[in-house]
Amino acid sequence: LQTIYKTKKNNPSKYLHQILGGWKESADGVIYSNWVTGDFEEREVMCYGQDFGFSNDETTLIKVSVDIPERKVWVKECFAKPNLSTSDIARLNKAYAGISLIICDNSEPRLIRELKNAGLNIKPTIKKSGSILSGVALVQDYKIIVDKNSESIIKELNNYVWKDKGTVPIDKFNHTLDAIRYAMAYLVQGKSSGIYHIR
């Protein structure tokens, strides 16, 4: 009951959808309403998240900084670009992340290996059954502060909705948001124990 009360107080939209089984207050059913724009703050708990695009889909790199006790996360878009080659991704990652840790989409092992060979500190996220919903719930539990110049993140936050008012998110407007999920799963759930996953 304490958990339910805390959810109702801190995240009423999550309470409405998950606890009461209702549709969120937003007319378009956006999944994340727990965000504002503001200045990016670098905290001790920080890494980058990356989602790989295919053809016209964007490859994204997002800087993510978390204050776990305060349940706040700061996110900043480094790039969100379609049609990138492996060398393009390596060059951009080096420019923005340097040798900092990048937690990435695990669907492209060959690409990840090539990025590692290029000198990047990159690891695939570990996905398990139900990873999308649990990852969404994790992000919903935090106040998201979005860098005001992160246009792709803001666009996706305004358009990422539940499919058919159900329990599955639509599979679009999610390239920056998936990158944020990967980074948060590592920083919040797995960093201290040496493992990371989206449960």
Residue ranges of predicted features:
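Acidic, Mg2+-coordinating catalytic module of metal-dependent nucleases/exonucleases
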Residues: D171-K191
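Intrinsic-disorder/low-complexity linker and hinge segments
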Residues: G38-E42, V188-I195
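ATPase catalytic-site recognition across NTP-hydrolyzing enzymes
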Residues: L1-Q50
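Short, structured patches in soluble enzyme cores that scaffold and shape functional sites
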Residues: G21-W23, S65, F79
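Gly/Thr-rich phosphate-binding beta-strand-loop-beta motif of the actin/hexokinase/Hsp70
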Residues: E42-S65
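A residue-level signal for conserved active-site and pocket-lining positions in enzyme catalytic cores
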Residues: I19, D51, L61, I102, ...
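Short, solvent-exposed loop/turn segments at secondary-structure junctions
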Residues: K24, F54-S55, P109-R110
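Mg2+-dependent endonuclease catalytic cores in nucleic-acid-processing enzymes, primarily RNase H-like
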Residues: I62, E70-D171, G190, Y196-R199
